[in-house]
Design a protein with these regions (language model features):
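HIT superfamily nucleotide-processing domains
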Residues: 1-112
């Protein structure tokens, strides 16, 4: 599969890892939109959140949300924004489900 995030998850492409376990990987965004901007991805390929999350793979979304507070703490923050861009018109550029975790003094009303 020619998926950027799959290649990052399996180590073909290096990343600045924040957290990793057997199910997920969290790494710093290469073009951060806030002081803290981390991407959290499942290691298993799930194409997007709108059309491809189903009964067989939906538990990974809950798992990611359960781990985000721990990931945020590792980044030194206790308040943050979680964003999921779903589809081309929403700005999704990598077709592998992922969540942006953002925090910082200059975040205010901005969106990714």
């Amino acid at each position: 599969m020619d998926c950027l995030f799959c290649k990052i998850a399996n180590g073909e492409i290096p990343s600045n890892k924040v957290y990793e376990d057997e199910k997920i990987l969290a790494f710093r965004d290469i073009a951060p939109q806030a002081d803290v901007h981390v991407l959290v991805i499942p290691k298993e390929h799930v194409a997007s959140s709108a059309n491809d999350v189903n009964a067989e793979n939906c538990e990974i979304v809950g798992y990611i949300f359960a781990k985000i507070p721990e990931i945020a703490k590792l980044c030194g923050v206790d308040s943050y924004r979680i964003i999921n861009n779903c589809g081309d018109k929403a700005g999704q550029t990598v077709k592998h489900i992922h969540f942006h975790v953002l925090s910082g003094d200059n975040l205010s009303e901005r969106l990714v």
